[in-house]
Regions:
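Short acidic-aromatic low-complexity motifs
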Residues: 13-18
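Asp-based phosphoryl-transfer active-site loop
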Residues: 120
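Vicinal oxygen chelate
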Residues: 1-8, 30-85, 89-117
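Conserved active-site tyrosine of GNAT-family acetyltransferases
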Residues: 19-24, 94
Length: 120
């Protein structure tokens, strides 16, 4: 079998700069790339600081169908599972930066869980 990995997952956004601000300022992700592709499209990659795994490709919606997916990209399921080496530090810092949480953190058999809202 070949050696494969997921390089990026697409996150459909309303506006590139608004999404970059959310991910880099609120979540403290790194902006890995922001390359214009044409007059309307950019190749924008973000990832958690220190990550060597999968990146998020921020893709601006360019059709009514894509616009309908903004804010509901996973049909109401959790979109992102973000692992950290210090849950409480990161959770408290995110709250300080204005990230809104759906509920208080809770302990599950697989770890501590906190559900937060993205910009949509």
């Amino acid at each position: 079998m070949t050696n494969q990995r997921i390089g990026a997952l697409t996150f459909v956004v309303r506006d590139y700069d608004e999404a970059i601000e959310f991910f880099t300022q609120k979540l403290q992700f790194d902006l890995l790339e922001d390359t214009p592709l044409d007059e309307h499209k950019r190749w924008v990659l973000v990832a958690p600081r220190g990550s060597t795994g999968t990146n998020l490709l921020l893709a601006k919606a360019d059709s009514p169908t894509q616009e309908l997916a903004i804010g509901n990209q996973t049909g109401g399921r959790v979109f992102l599972f973000l692992h950290t080496d210090d849950f409480w530090r990161d959770c408290n810092e995110m709250k300080t930066r204005g990230v809104k949480f759906a509920e208080e953190p809770r302990t599950e058999s697989y770890g501590t869980v906190a559900v937060f809202f993205d910009l949509y």
